[in-house]
């Protein structure tokens, strides 16, 4: 490490954490080769939404060092685990919930997982909606079956870079499950602890609607980084979303933010915007919790889900896909802020 370069880098703050890159441990390499400064910066998440700003700030700071005429920046990523990791090898467990059904929660969960994976993170997706599993179908793996490895642990199925477990891949198609609370609790325990998830940066959990046994089992079984609430602008959905938020508060699960799905509709023939389910309701919740994003109502998102391809991959240029990508990156940033804010302050490099 070159001391002069480190001193310059210690003046560059992470825009979200408001601490310098050196004290945060984000500088892996800082060397001077002739008049070229060569540095490697490990971002807090592969989905860092402020990578461009960090690159500009690093370049500007290093060009102020005497003798430096050019800067070469390599970016890596190192997702830091929560203070108390949730499961062996799993850095963060993120719950995706809603107060009621029909708000597009599973679609959001699938696209969040696929987006994080596309950005380079190691992602798992647990379909905890035991009575109405839909993740497997949305990932194009409705006919696949879960198998066991040599340690007799369930081997997650992989699709679009995401490892997932769903009851749809364990029970016969069309068969209804009539389980009481203890059986649900046992199933959730198995999904979490008897599955060979491997090393994951994020395990996204698609919860069933409401505030029932599955939610309680999850919050009692593993250390959860936080929850994302999916709602629509409709008043009745917002009322139920508030109940879900209250449940997580009582279970001491941090609410990372709110996603307003089906926020508006843009007519493809006229370009006019229609607020089919109302407008701005989630911003009231956002006064207490971050509004992670507003996803427009888009028929292609539904078609892509039916076809087994996340919208962010099938139609990445669409407004809905871009909004979902932005939500995933904002969520990753929220997790990084929460995790790194727990680090002790370090003295700056002198």
Swiss-Prot record:
Leader sequence segment: none
InterPro entries (UniProt xref): FSCA_dom_sf, MIP18-like, Mrp-like_CS, Mrp/NBP35_ATP-bd, NUBPL-like, P-loop_NTPase, YlxH/NBP35
Residue sites binding ATP per the record: 99-106
GO MF annotations, alphabetized: 4 iron, 4 sulfur cluster binding; ATP binding; ATP hydrolysis activity; ATP-dependent FeS chaperone activity; metal ion binding
Gene Ontology biological-process annotations: iron-sulfur cluster assembly
Top-rank lineage group of the source organism: Bacteria
The protein's assembly and partners: Homodimer.
The family this protein is said to belong to: In the N-terminal section; belongs to the MIP18 family. In the C-terminal section; belongs to the Mrp/NBP35 ATP-binding proteins family.
Full protein name: Iron-sulfur cluster carrier protein
Organism: Deinococcus radiodurans (strain ATCC 13939 / DSM 20539 / JCM 16871 / CCUG 27074 / LMG 4051 / NBRC 15346 / NCIMB 9279 / VKM B-1422 / R1)
